[in-house]
Amino acid sequence: MMSRETLRALVEASHKRGKLAVVHVGTEQQARDAINASADGPAHMFTGEMAGADFGKFAASHSVFVIPTLATLYSTCGKSGAPALLEDPYLKSFIRPEGRVLLEQPWPYAKASCTGTATAMKELAEARVRILAGTDAPMPGTTYGASLHDELVLLVRTGLTPLQALQAATSVPARAFHLEDRGLIRAGMRADLVLVKGEPTRDIQATRHIIAVWKRGIRFQR
């Protein structure tokens, strides 16, 4: 366990070098310690019961972002979205064999509850804290690419609107990491695009029905 003094020193050293300080946390207290140490944001939400009822307001008052990695946390609670991904008609044919192995891999130890996770996420959403989509792949029950679609569903289930979930995977992380040339569809921006069938601003699962992908303006053949 890192001391608070060491944590603060590391955050300060990172900022002096012009770098963001994103801190791995596993409990509510660790998240609060990271935020109090002036970290730019904690990575991972926490499980179990919450000690306080003001985490969302606390995070908002420090202008941090949060990368909850719900896909992994819900896997630790025995509520993995992996089985649904493996059978999803739009995704399953694109999951590589090594990705399938990861999705089928059970978590080595299960936590009792994700109640605290859901409660904290609701508070963060109500306080309009910046949420960044991330999965923590390749942890058990997750894989690169496909698990992000599960993450978006969980973000909506725990308090974000579908539009906010889409922003959590596009414009919000681009701004948080100072990537000014991407994250939006706008003249002069990088043409990193995904075309889907449906209306993901109403039904977040529409992101799974991918028609085409472009990176730097070049269309990928699937």
Predicted feature residues:
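Histidine/acidic-residue-rich, glycine-tolerant segments that coordinate divalent metal ions
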Residues: 1-34, 44-46, 50
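Generic structural signal for hydrophobic
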Residues: 10, 14, 34-37, 59, ...
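Divalent metal-coordination and catalytic microenvironments
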Residues: 14, 24, 42, 66, ...
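Short glycine/serine/threonine/alanine-rich loop segments
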Residues: 18-20, 39, 64, 129, ...
